[in-house]
Amino acid sequence: MIDWVKVRKECKRLGIFPKGFWNPLHCNFEECGIQMLLSERSVGKTTGILLVGMVLNSLYGVRIHYIRNTKNMLRESIVSDLFSTIISCGYVSKVTNGRYNSIRYVKNERKWYYILQDEDGIMIEQAPECLMYAMSVDNADNYKSGYSCPTADWIIVDEFISTQEYQTNNFLPLNDIFSTLIRFRDSATIIFLANTIHIEHFIFYEYAIQDQVKSLQYGDSKIYESPLGTKIYIEFIKDKEVSRKKQNVNKRYFGFNNKKLSAIRGGNWIVSNYPHIKLTSENSKLLFNRIYVETKGMLINISIYQSKDIGLIA
């Protein structure tokens, strides 16, 4: 079992979370097996979570698992630099007590390894076991029978919110991956990370926390418990240093009274934009108004109009 007091003390001893930057050590890892961390970009969520995973690897031999929605998102050009900040800050040497000084991504294995390299960047030694393994939701069926890891106690689901892809069928295969990794252990932690703050994302409805999430304000953190007792820690991250820098950028480029820019400016949910048709008694006729559709836990009333210009409208 992971001793989180010990983990936090080790992180502080190593000095890998400098003051003025967001770090995840305040998150409720003891009580909640699922964490959802939401923010704008450049807060340092992924780097912070990877650093904690590295400390868990050092203390307990934990293998980090990094999950994206599709195999295409695991291209070397996308994921090879995940540890770049950690490497450049010299944290690899700190966490490994000088044994290694860099991290290498092996493309054909989809694994990251600690390595020791000389001043010219030539590899001298590679760790025998990988630090992190990459997985994709669209490959979930293959993991069921072909993969197991008894130390998969740090599971990262990166960029879980996307406005570009249809993901509503991802929930079951994603949880299949969790089940494959966790097996019968209760020591694992699942961390969802998002740079797009979309209040209507399907995952909130699948976990039946959509109403609670909608009440979150910038800087809030809360614990939600399901009727069956599963606890989720969710945080809408507010980083003071990032917010200060954002103010200047927003004033120069995004200072418009337009809700569509809310998520770009930071501190608010992204707003979905839908076209609306103006209807008047002169250009349309109401045909039905007692049609109801149940979706995402809500009952929506739909009215059908006959328009003179474009026909039937719902």
Q: What are these model-derived regions, one by one?
A:
Residues 2-314:
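Phosphate/NTP-binding elements of NTP-utilizing enzymes
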